[in-house]
Amino acid sequence: MRAVFIQGAEEHPAAFCYQVNGSCPRTVHTLGIQLVIYLACAAGMLIIVLGNVFVAFAVSYFKALHTPTNFLLLSLALADMFLGLLVLPLSTIRSVESCWFFGDFLCRLHTYLDTLFCLTSIFHLCFISIDRHCAICDPLLYPSKFTVRVALRYILAGWGVPAAYTSLFLYTDVVETRLSQWLEEMPCVGSCQLLLNKFWGWLNFPLFFVPCLIMISLYVKIFVVATRQAQQITTLSKSLAGAAKHERKAAKTLGIAVGIYLLCWLPFTIDTMVDSLLHFITPPLVFDIFIWFAYFNSACNPIIYVFSYQWFRKALKLTLSQKVFSPQTRTVDLYQE
């Protein structure tokens, strides 16, 4: 992901980030506007953190939810939760103040965590699509093919590959020594802008779009197979019909999650690629909106689960009613109608 950052003032630069030569201009908002933005961002962070904390708790606590698919959902929820806890607070200050006040070390760390958690979410959604494809298109072999051990391998890859990739570009001199012709110097003092160059923008394009293409192609096949299964469901036994219905509903729910992900991330991803060709002419305010639209995706998954998964609503009800503290609650069958 391109490291973002308000480089200058959008309308009336009333001040500078620092009282030094080469400082970035700063847009000073009225107190009312600042308060509204801070409250909106705080509400978004609260939804992201609390929603994903509950998903992680439910899957961890209730034994009925200890399935390969749900372990992937748990890992996805942790990535979104950490984004809300560790990245968005500083992103909020950067967006409101239009400057970065936390130094080079935190700038690099913030960019690392931002990129890590976002790429981890993308990889997990791709792996969940593979899981659903296997469950719908090859249901007889699915229990033996997609085991908990396989899910744990996917989780390890979903965290390990983004961590290694991001570390390579942010904490080594590989880019600077071998691709120095692509790099541009920091435009001004007070921006958190790392590796802002054409190579960085184009390299991130396939990292976002290849998983997207995989997810779309898998869900197209899932839709075709699920439609055919729905037409044949009357010939199945009651137990097999119920299992097939459950798998199709899970695939539909996760398909909605993938669709919302695409809507949230497409503006930012396309702009990152196109903007690198046009010498980064996107206004800072517009680019910041694209970034927050992408962040919004982390709040969507728990909301989708509330409206789509009966087990999620049951787990939420048990938790809020404090029945979760009963020893028998952990073994409740949340999938029972």
From Swiss-Prot:
PROSITE patterns: G_PROTEIN_RECEP_F1_1, G_PROTEIN_RECEP_F1_2. Keywords: Cell membrane, Disulfide bond, G-protein coupled receptor, Glycoprotein, Membrane, Receptor, Transducer, Transmembrane, Transmembrane helix. It holds the Pfam family 7tm_1. Gene3D superfamilies: Rhodopsin 7-helix transmembrane proteins (1.20.1070.10). Disulfide bonds join C24-C188, C99-C192. Residues 176-189 are annotated as: Extracellular Loop 2 (ECL2). GO terms for cellular component: plasma membrane. It is a multi-pass membrane protein. In addition to the well known disulfide bond common to G-protein coupled receptor 1 family, trace amine-associated receptors (TAARs) contain an unique disulfide bond (Cys-24-Cys-188) connecting the N-terminus to the extracellular Loop 2 (ECL2), which is required for agonist-induced receptor activation. Olfactory receptor specific for trimethylamine, a trace amine. Also activated at lower level by dimethylethylamine. Trimethylamine is a bacterial metabolite found in some animal odors, and to humans it is a repulsive odor associated with bad breath and spoiled food. Trimethylamine-binding causes a conformation change that triggers signaling via G(s)-class of G alpha proteins (GNAL or GNAS). This is Trace amine-associated receptor 5.
